[in-house]
Regions:
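C-terminal ends of transmembrane helices
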Residues: 19-31, 155-166, 211-221
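Interfacial loop-to-transmembrane junctions
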Residues: 218-237
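Cytoplasmic-side transmembrane-helix entry/capping segments in multi-pass membrane proteins
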Residues: 31-42, 169-178, 226-232
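Generic multipass alpha-helical transmembrane bundles of integral membrane proteins
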Residues: 4, 8-19, 36-173, 185-192
Length: 249
């Protein structure tokens, strides 16, 4: 019997990529969105092939895949902004301040913005899908560090949603993070029953903090912003150490 994250997932990944290619050929007007199944299928095929060839190392392979994916999620806005070539020229001298502005091609800026925004949306969907695919396997490993890695990745994704201002990206990011946290909590409690009480208390504390800063404290204070930034930074910094410990221990 083949594990789900090996040969079966490889077949599903190839089918998803093939469906994306057919979608791009059939619907040229929505061609950028056909890259979503192509990218998800192509990226999932890599750890699936490695897991099929090295089934004993399947857990390690998906731990590395999840860690790289979670770190890539934090760099997506910068990567898409660089790809769209949108920059702001700030004057550095008095002559530049009083100089006549250069002509601005608004249509070109609009096209670049649409391209960058679409790429960012596609990237967020791919990251969310990869983390959700890997979450069941990581939460059923012998070590609870796999669950800790998933929790850090999804919490970082949830905290990163504070910087999102488009409705569709907000739905994808918050929805995937919420589903991932629920899956992590339910599977890790079943697999590692000795950690059920601390995990439940941690999730209750996170829910209380979210409700407090979202609904109770209507005014966004500088303290709350700094606490959220610090929490997001800690989640990102914990990903690589947790992945290393989950592999070596």
């Amino acid at each position: 019997k083949q594990p789900l994250h090996a040969l079966p997932l490889l077949g599903a990944s190839l089918g998803l990529a093939a469906a994306g290619i057919l979608m791009s050929l059939a619907a040229s007007k929505t061609r950028p969105y056909s890259y979503i199944p192509i990218l998800i299928g192509a990226i999932c095929a890599i750890p699936s092939v490695l897991s099929t060839l090295m089934p004993q190392q399947m857990g390690h392979i998906w731990i590395l895949t999840s860690a790289v994916t979670a770190l890539t999620a934090s760099a997506l806005p910068w990567m898409c902004l660089s790809f769209a070539r949108i920059s702001v020229d700030s004057p550095h001298s008095e002559s530049e301040i009083f100089a006549l502005p250069n002509d601005i091609d608004y249509q070109d800026i609009k096209r670049r913005y649409i391209a960058g925004s679409t790429m960012l949306f596609i990237g967020r969907i791919c990251v969310a899908a990869l983390l959700l695919i890997a979450a069941p396997l990581l939460n059923t490993l012998d070590t609870p560090l796999g669950s800790a890695l998933c929790l850090a990745a999804f919490l970082g994704m949830l905290l990163d949603s504070r910087q999102i201002y488009t409705f569709r990206e907000m739905c994808v990011t918050v929805g995937a993070a919420g589903i991932g946290i629920i899956v992590t909590g339910s599977l890790s409690v079943q697999t590692h029953q000795e950690f059920s009480i601390p995990l439940i208390l941690l999730m209750l504390a996170c829910a209380f903090a979210t409700i407090l800063f979202t609904y109770v404290l209507r005014k966004h204070t500088l303290f709350a912003t700094r606490v959220a930034d610090a929490a997001e930074t800690i989640c990102i910094m914990l990903i690589l150490p947790l992945a290393y410990l989950a592999i070596t221990l």
